[in-house]
């Protein structure tokens, strides 16, 4: 076990002091090592004490799992969390981001930012002098993907060559699944209606990152997308900020519900994933949500372990 821990620490040492704004910010080796460390922390084979360091959360979007999992992860690492809601700080009164980022860097050892625009996150990283983590933007959700592939690995073993089918909008979650999956050697299929594809630039980037023969595909037939897949993943059809499009999207996504009939086309041992919150009866049927194939709540738990590993790596606590 000591040898394994040393190997993981060596692979993760280049991450110390770096930002994590995108799944593509880590190499294939570094991404795999984050999952290895997360598994060690989850099993209790590894314990890390960061010595009372401080995480600052800057969340302008609502959050349950991301907020709580970061807070608990930091506590388990022996650190503390400061919740910096813009509504109750000077950010809400127009203080420039560049001033806030530099001041918070004097108080905190790492910042996690959850906001709408990716550029705002990039600006925080530019001005901060401590690591900045993407806790979700409209472009990506990289911490979620770490938990997703940790869950898939727990269910089916080594990831290279496995297939994950994502059924739904080509959104931030889909983007990070493509990028992270490409690095890990996982075939990722995005099953979506016409007009709801991932951004072409992200698709091209994922394909350029693909290792060990992984394929990244966009397929407009949901049944074809899930055919033979080891994991079937879905998300809400209207993300935060798209509530006005709910009715239009319900029509566009008709036939894209992950239900019992669709799951028949997947691998017989396929697992079901959802980043939550879920709208039962829309993107996923109640039966599939509660089925034996569902690993949705394991997946939610794994946010904690994946982020604990990421925090330790970025703060050089290995």
Curated annotation (Swiss-Prot):
Main location: cytoplasm
GO CC annotation: cytoplasm
EC number, UniProt record: 2.1.3.3
Subcellular location: Cytoplasm
GO BP term (any one): arginine biosynthetic process via ornithine
Protein name: Ornithine carbamoyltransferase
Family: Belongs to the aspartate/ornithine carbamoyltransferase superfamily. OTCase family.
Entry keywords, A to Z: Amino-acid biosynthesis, Arginine biosynthesis, Cytoplasm, Transferase
Coiled-coil boundaries: none
Protein purpose: Reversibly catalyzes the transfer of the carbamoyl group from carbamoyl phosphate (CP) to the N(epsilon) atom of ornithine (ORN) to produce L-citrulline.
Domain of life: Bacteria
UniProt organism field: Parasynechococcus marenigrum (strain WH8102)
Catalysed conversion reaction: carbamoyl phosphate + L-ornithine = L-citrulline + phosphate + H(+)
Binding site for carbamoyl phosphate: 63-66, 90, 114, 141-144, 275-276, 303
């Amino acid at each position: 076990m000591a040898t394994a821990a040393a190997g993981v620490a060596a692979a993760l040492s280049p991450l110390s002091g770096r930002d994590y704004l995108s799944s593509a910010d880590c190499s294939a080796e570094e991404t795999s090592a984050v999952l290895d460390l997360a598994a060690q922390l989850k099993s209790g084979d590894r314990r890390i004490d960061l010595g009372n360091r401080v995480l600052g959360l800057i969340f302008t979007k609502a959050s349950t799992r991301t907020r709580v999992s970061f807070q608990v992860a930091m506590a388990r690492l022996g650190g503390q969390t400061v919740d910096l809601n813009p509504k109750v700080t000077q950010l809400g009164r127009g203080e420039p981001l560049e001033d806030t980022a530099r001041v918070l860097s004097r108080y905190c050892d790492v910042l996690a930012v959850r906001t709408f625009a990716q550029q705002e996150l990039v600006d925080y990283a530019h001005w901060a002098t401590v690591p900045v983590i993407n806790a979700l933007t409209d472009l990506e959700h990289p911490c979620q993907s770490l938990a997703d592939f940790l869950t898939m690995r727990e269910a089916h073993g080594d990831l290279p060559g496995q297939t994950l089918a994502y059924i739904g909008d080509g959104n931030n979650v889909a983007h990070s699944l493509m990028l992270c999956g490409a690095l890990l050697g996982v075939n990722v299929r995005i099953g979506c209606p016409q007009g709801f594809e991932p951004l072409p630039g992200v698709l091209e980037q994922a394909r350029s990152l693909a290792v060990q023969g992984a394929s990244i595909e966009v397929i407009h037939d949901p049944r074809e997308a899930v055919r033979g897949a080891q994991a079937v993943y879905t998300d809400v059809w209207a993300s935060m900020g798209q509530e006005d499009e709910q009715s239009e999207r319900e029509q566009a996504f008709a036939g894209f519900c992950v239900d019992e009939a669709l799951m028949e086309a997947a691998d017989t041992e396929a697992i079901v994933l959802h980043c939550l919150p879920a709208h039962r009866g829309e993107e996923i049927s109640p039966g599939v949500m509660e089925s034996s194939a569902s690993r949705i709540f394991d997946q939610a738990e794994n946010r904690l372990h994946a982020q604990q590993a990421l925090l330790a790596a970025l703060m050089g606590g290995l």
